[in-house]
């Protein structure tokens, strides 16, 4: 079983649960008489209570505003998983004349056995609320995938808590190059990632799920990006980053045993639940004009 598959176990279970859980109602993405605002998209009744509960940790309005999301933008979301951010981005872009490309897992990637299931669950999600989500175009990102979006077409590309997976799979460099190719000159690469403490030698496989911020910036610069600014929107000073099962010990995954092992029902989550979700870097990088 691949490193990437193991680290994304929570993604698969979340994606496959889309059809099993109670469905949030679909609403028209454009309220009568005015365009849908980002705040209204975040508050939308189509988002589940479980997803909304995570807003306190992920700060979607502040984060997307920091990256410069605008009405009518063309956005590429790499590896959307079960669609936590898609539930915000797709209705907002559909209502404002924008476009969302979802560069999902490469379904035929031999190193990721669950990829086809994850992609199929995501397609079902979009199909079941087609009026809400609009025309989301699903592309792919993986070891041998083609373009994530047409060249020089995107205003904003998003890497949302996935870079550690790509490092483990040896495709992080490709992610940066594919993002660079998709962006318009002057376009923005927005990164949210679990942040390791600075100093020492970076773990190039990100085995515990944390990545040094300086190393992320270095990879981006090597692909041609310019660092515009950083933010502490998603920082969590309570995160000690020394958890027994890596970042996945914390919510929302709450792992209780080593990767690939059955969950331990006797594991005490209290300490880790009190920390909350991980300390995360939030970066805004630019493709030069």
Predicted regions, residues:
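Bacterial signal peptide processing site
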Residues: 22-24
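A short acidic, Gly/Pro-enriched loop at the edge of an enzyme's catalytic core
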Residues: 148-157
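Conserved beta-strand signature within the Rossmann-like core of class I S-adenosyl-L-methionine
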Residues: 186-193
